[in-house]
A protein has these predicted regions:
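Conserved N-terminal segment of class I S-adenosyl-L-methionine
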Residues: 1-134, 138, 149-151
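A short, conserved alpha-helix within the catalytic core of class I
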Residues: 144-154
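A short His-aromatic
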Residues: 139, 143
């Protein structure tokens, strides 16, 4: 018995490595998952992704306040090693920063120039046309629908 509908067979490529060989993996309740035999990623069928509106509303529930001391301590685990490697004359992009970026605020406090991009909260795509000395994607990658496309965008 095939547990995957004909609609599910429309999954044509792996969202991570872009292989054209995704295979049905498992169905859990109504959610259908796929696997890639090349990179071994497991991914949810696009048919089950949240709508853009629901995704936006979900992100509004995140409590990553740039002034919250506990969250700043958490973010400093990324910031501190970067501060050791970067010159203050460098410019960075905080990609997928959300509505309030503690990381960007902390970089600015240390004298860095940071540009914000987020498809929901800072959607000005023209900032993606510039070159940056560094790019951060803190707590972001797991939200990418098509990671390969996002990383290619950042690499161009």
């Amino acid at each position: 018995m095939n547990i995957f509908s004909n609609e599910e067979k429309k999954v044509k490529s792996c969202p991570v490595c872009l292989s054209l060989q995704p295979k049905p993996f498992i169905k859990i309740q109504a959610l259908q998952y796929w696997t890639c035999p090349i990179c071994e990623v497991k991914f949810l069928s696009p048919n089950h992704w949240l709508s853009k509106k629901d995704e936006y509303e979900f992100y509004l529930t995140h409590e990553n306040d740039a002034d919250n001391l506990g969250y700043r301590k958490f973010v400093s685990k990324l910031l501190e090693p970067l501060l050791e490697k970067l010159s203050k004359k460098t410019a960075g992009l905080d990609y997928g920063c959300g509505p309030s970026s503690a990381l960007a605020k902390m970089f600015v406090e240390h004298g860095f120039k940071i540009t914000l991009y987020d498809p929901f909260f800072y959607p000005a795509k023209d900032v993606l046309n510039f070159k940056y000395d560094f790019i951060t994607c803190s707590e972001v990658v797991e939200h990418f629908h098509y990671p390969a496309k996002e990383f290619n965008k950042l690499n161009s």
